[in-house]
Amino acid sequence: MEFWQHIYSNFNVIAFSIFGLKVHWYGIMYVIALLLALLLAKFFVKKFQLDINEKHLDSYFIWVEIGVILGARLGYILIYDANTMYYITHPWQIFNPYINGEFVGIRGMSYHGAIIGFLIATLLFCKKYKTNPWIFLDLVALSVPLAYVFGRIGNFLNQELFGRITNVPWGIYVDGILRHPSQLYEAFLEGIVVFIIVYLARFKQSFQGELILVYAGAYSLARFICEFYREPDFGIGFVLWGMSMGQILSFIMFITALLVYICIKFKKVNI
């Protein structure tokens, strides 16, 4: 366990450089996650014979990727970043990948902000092409969780979003302090476990939109649990009743998904 506990001391967050441009492992994991999500979506379209053509699917993923990036970055700045006012007065710095002249990529993304950007992009896309948004949302619920695993592995390799102080033997040292590898807990619970739940729910699906609601509920519950092992965001700490901002947002997400599910499932609301 000695090597594992000191893995950050023996690992470079930069995978390689091209003409002086440093390529980080996080960026590589992000690209893998994006491609895997698209490939899984195409697989599930064929497997479950969904009424989505490949051209629309490719276009849709471009739309939602833009929405996710915008939502994730803006969400982080508005919710988590300690320099919110700076970015509001200097909006051109929001997507600036350079710090002191060095390319470091775009840092600081919020998952809950990404969700909002994703939903807006989905609604705009479906309105433009006159398609049913619930079909696409259910497809995303199936294809995203496994891809999400690579996103959290990317966080781990980038040595960010680390866990709380611990004494468990599988902990890792971060700046000389033993901490939970919470990114890997999240990869398992929020990625693999959530996928299994959504995939099994597909075979008992009773209405369009059910899978995305199951995903939202399962993810928010998994995230709420993982937050107990994840270090609260810098500058925010614990917000209410000993809960982190991630837990509060996950709680809101869970209640929202549950209420919508109940309204549709038991009150026969047309969608």
Curated annotation (Swiss-Prot):
Entry similarity comment: Belongs to the Lgt family.
Entry GO CC: plasma membrane
Signal peptide (from-to): none
Top EC category: transferase
Pathway: Protein modification; lipoprotein biosynthesis (diacylglyceryl transfer)
Enzyme nomenclature, EC number: 2.5.1.145
Listed transmembrane segments: 25-45, 60-80, 103-123, 134-154, 181-201, 209-229, 235-255
Biological process, per Gene Ontology: lipoprotein biosynthetic process
Keywords in alphabetical order: Cell inner membrane, Cell membrane, Membrane, Transferase, Transmembrane, Transmembrane helix
InterPro entries, sorted: Lgt (IPR001640)
Name of the featured protein: Phosphatidylglycerol--prolipoprotein diacylglyceryl transferase
Organism ancestry: Bacteria, Pseudomonadati, Campylobacterota, Epsilonproteobacteria, Campylobacterales
Task of the protein: Catalyzes the transfer of the diacylglyceryl group from phosphatidylglycerol to the sulfhydryl group of the N-terminal cysteine of a prolipoprotein, the first step in the formation of mature lipoproteins.
